[in-house]
């Protein structure tokens, strides 16, 4: 049996552009894509912290070093410039793959600079 597991995450990314008339997708700074292990044209899930919207699209490469997070096409109706979003990727893994699996977690500041990276989500305490 396969389980769907988190593989990459950009946490609290800030939307820098919302381009309604662009073809679709989400353009992400190439440095951020690489740190999170997200591939160009890979399906991504975007969770908007500001309004609760959750939607799927695909990643395209944004200019390296630009700190760009550009939500494009119809999805631009679900995110505004300045919104904090969480961008995730997932994969279906079998039991043997899950044993050693660790996601690539990238935590960002308000300017989309990398604050830290991790392979583990901290334990939530009461």
From Swiss-Prot:
Pfam families found in the cross-reference section: Asp_decarbox
Keyword Hydrolase: no
Cofactor: pyruvate
Pyruvic acid (Ser) modification, residue list: 25
Binding site for substrate: 57, 73-75
Keywords: Autocatalytic cleavage, Cytoplasm, Decarboxylase, Lyase, Pantothenate biosynthesis, Pyruvate, Schiff base, Zymogen
EC number: 4.1.1.11
GO cellular component: cytosol
Annotated GO MF terms: aspartate 1-decarboxylase activity
Family annotation (CDD domains): Asp_decarbox
Subunit structure: Heterooctamer of four alpha and four beta subunits.
One BP term from GO: pantothenate biosynthetic process
InterPro entries to which the protein is assigned, alphabetical: Asp_de-COase-like_dom_sf, Asp_decarbox
Post-translational modification: Is synthesized initially as an inactive proenzyme, which is activated by self-cleavage at a specific serine bond to produce a beta-subunit with a hydroxyl group at its C-terminus and an alpha-subunit with a pyruvoyl group at its N-terminus.
Protein name listed in UniProt: Aspartate 1-decarboxylase
Catalytic residue positions: 25 (schiff-base intermediate with substrate), 58 (proton donor)
Group of enzyme by EC: lyase
Function: Catalyzes the pyruvoyl-dependent decarboxylation of aspartate to produce beta-alanine.
Domain of life: Bacteria
Pathway annotation: Cofactor biosynthesis; (R)-pantothenate biosynthesis; beta-alanine from L-aspartate: step 1/1
Subcellular location(s) per record: Cytoplasm
Family stated for the protein in its record: Belongs to the PanD family.
Catalytic activity: L-aspartate + H(+) = beta-alanine + CO2
Cofactor binding annotation: Binds 1 pyruvoyl group covalently per subunit.
């Amino acid at each position: 049996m396969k389980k769907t597991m988190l593989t990459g995450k950009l946490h609290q990314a800030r939307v820098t552009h919302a381009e309604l008339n662009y073809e679709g997708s989400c353009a992400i700074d190439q440095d951020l894509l690489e740190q999170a292990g997200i591939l160009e044209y890979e399906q991504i899930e975007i969770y908007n912290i500001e309004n609760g919207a959750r939607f799927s699209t695909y990643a395209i490469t944004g200019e390296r070093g630009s700190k760009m997070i550009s939500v494009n096409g119809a999805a631009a109706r679900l995110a505004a410039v300045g919104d904090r979003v969480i961008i995730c990727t997932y994969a279906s893994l079998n039991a043997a793959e899950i044993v050693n699996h660790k996601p690539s977690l990238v935590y960002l500041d308000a300017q989309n600079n990398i604050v830290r990276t991790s392979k583990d989500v901290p334990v939530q305490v009461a």
